[in-house]
Amino acid sequence: MSKTIWVGAVAYDPKVVTIWEGMRRYFNDEARLPIEVVLFQSYEAQVTALLAAPGDLVPRIDIAWNTNLAYLQSDAWSDHRCQPIAMRDTDLGWMTKIVAVSGGSVATLADLKNRTLALGSRDSGHAAILPVHFLEREGLVEGRDYRTLRFDSDVGKHGDTGTSEAEVVRAVLDGRADAGAIGSPFWRTVRSERLVPEGALSEIWTSPPYNHCMFTARPELDSSVARRFAEALTRMSYNNPSHRAVLDAEGLRRWVKPHLDGYDSLREASAHQGFFKHPIAMSAAR
């Protein structure tokens, strides 16, 4: 019998329990690859568990379902020895949108000069880290060329909940901010579900594309085990009703191989903004 693989995920929403009940059932009953799931309250705790050594006074897991920031932190803190395994098709080609009130005074990036930009949680790649980074590339520096109104809700979950993006949109609508930065998936939801009056907001800028989540294995995990885990993921079929329920809940149609070229911008931004400093929990474990 195969050794159990311990997989970590962050419980950013109650649906995460349902998703991982379905994933565990698939791996154990169909893929014949036994897994157990550990839910964490923050990505920092999950990354610490992924990189923990025997004897450390923290939980240990073999594989983590990480955000892009958590994957890059795992990579940095393991001296680039952690193993990227797989990602969702929908993790490819994310973008950040800057939105403003339609017909208002902010219609281009240049109009942000001396105005207020709303940002999401400080550890959200799409709603905070990358917007600041990309705007700096465009010659707009936070605190010098524009002010920020930050909504640090659900810090530790890397923007997964969407709560801070909802706050950003509200701030733009009620005039507390002149524009706001949100992820392209949230912007699609705003429009498709009509979360604001139709035509109330317009996108004034779109970032270059980047990638989002990544299954990440600890450095010491046997590469054959990581490969079997990835192969089991790719055998999930959207045409299978039991698989589809899990895939829909997790927001994808199929699992794909790692596309590592979509993380360069966030890696640069995270290093510059101090997100690769070792967390207290990991320092204590060592």
Descriptions of predicted regions:
Residues T4-E30, F40, G93-V168, A245, ...:
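Bilobed "Venus flytrap"/periplasmic-binding protein-like clamshell domains
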Residues A45, A70-Y71, N114, F186-W187, ...:
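Alpha-helix capping/helix-boundary segments
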Residues Q73-A76, I129, R191-S192, A226-R227:
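Short glycine-/acidic-enriched loop or helix-start segments at secondary-structure transitions
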